Regions:
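Active-site glycine-rich loops that stabilize anionic/oxyanionic intermediates
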Residues: 2, 9-13, 203
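The serine-hydrolase catalytic nucleophile loop
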Residues: 11-23
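Alpha/beta-hydrolase active-site loop
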Residues: 51-70
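Alpha/beta-hydrolase fold nucleophile elbow
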Residues: 72-85
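Alpha/beta-hydrolase-fold enzymes
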Residues: 84-171
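Short beta-strand/loop motif that positions the catalytic acidic residue
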Residues: 193, 199-201, 205
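Short alpha-helix in the alpha/beta-hydrolase fold that links the catalytic acid
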Residues: 195, 209-218
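Catalytic active-site module of serine/aspartate enzymes centered on a nucleophile-bearing elbow/loop
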Residues: 231-265
Length: 265
């Protein structure tokens, strides 16, 4: 085993559907891959799609990954975070909590800022903030069709309907506010990113803002940083693009892992 890769899934995914295929590809390249469904997502316990505290969610994920890394069989093996979309925010928050405990991070269309095309207008946000105090679990946040925005290939977009355990309803009020608060925090802390990173983002992404991925690349204090922007690619660069484009992204990821795992041996 070359290294451990700990996967953090996105808001509209779980670790048992699209992410499973990504994990198998990375594992086939010689890596031990580990993932979990967040509380309230996938097969985990909790109210479906409800994030009462993003910080608590991050703590739960970090605790699980710490148990993996603490296994005596994996002692001395490099470990990497992999975060896709909202999972990119989870990975960055874990890094902020544990700045010296990971050998690098792979950030795929990371949720450093939710695109203005998806976020409700400012007056609507103020109403939702007020309502969230009274009705935090209610599904009242207006939302565009994320599959339409995220998947370029229609045939692959249609596959999202088979991910029956993924959350597909309107966001719950508290969940939406926690995600917005988290992105605001991350956007203000880009300079603190100190571990080796590769950022991969479609330049036509209308879900998470590729401009902030550029900011992350420019502002992160690590000198070991790579940015890959894919021309005309949408949000789901590992699931919703033409096959040859997906293979290119996967190759970029495994090549980066190979280079950085070799450095740690």
């Amino acid at each position: 085993m070359k290294a451990i890769v700990c996967l953090c899934h996105g808001y509209g995914d779980t670790c048992t559907f699209f992410l499973d295929g990504i994990a198998r590809n990375i594992a086939a390249a010689g890596y031990g891959v580990f993932a979990l469904d967040y509380p309230g997502f996938g097969l985990s316990e909790g109210l479906h799609g409800y994030i009462p505290s993003f910080d608590t969610l991050v703590d739960d994920v970090a605790e699980t990954f710490a148990k993996v890394k603490g296994n005596p069989d994996y002692r001395g093996i490099p470990s990497f975070l992999f975060g896709q979309s909202m999972g990119g925010a989870v990975a960055l928050k874990i890094h902020f909590k544990q700045p010296d405990e990971w050998n690098g991070a792979i950030l795929v269309a990371p949720m450093c800022k939710i695109s203005d095309d998806v976020v409700p207008a400012w007056p609507v946000q103020q109403v939702l903030i007020f309502l969230a105090k009274l009705l935090p679990k209610e599904k009242l946040v207006p939302q565009k069709d994320l599959a339409e925005l995220a998947f370029k290939e229609e045939e692959k977009r249609e596959q999202t309907s088979y991910n029956v355990i993924a959350y597909k309803d309107k966001p719950r009020l508290r969940t939406a506010l926690e995600m917005l608060r988290t992105t605001q925090e991350i956007e203000s802390r880009l300079e603190e990113v100190s571990l080796p990173i590769i950022i991969l983002h479609g330049d036509a992404d209308l879900v998470t803002d590729p401009a902030v991925s550029k900011d992350l690349y420019e502002k992160a204090k690590t000198s070991d940083k790579t940015l890959r922007l894919y021309k005309d690619a949408y949000h789901s660069i590992l699931e919703g693009e033409p096959d040859e484009a997906i293979f290119q992204v996967l190759d970029d990821i495994t090549s980066w892992l190979d280079q950085h795992s070799a450095k740690e041996v």
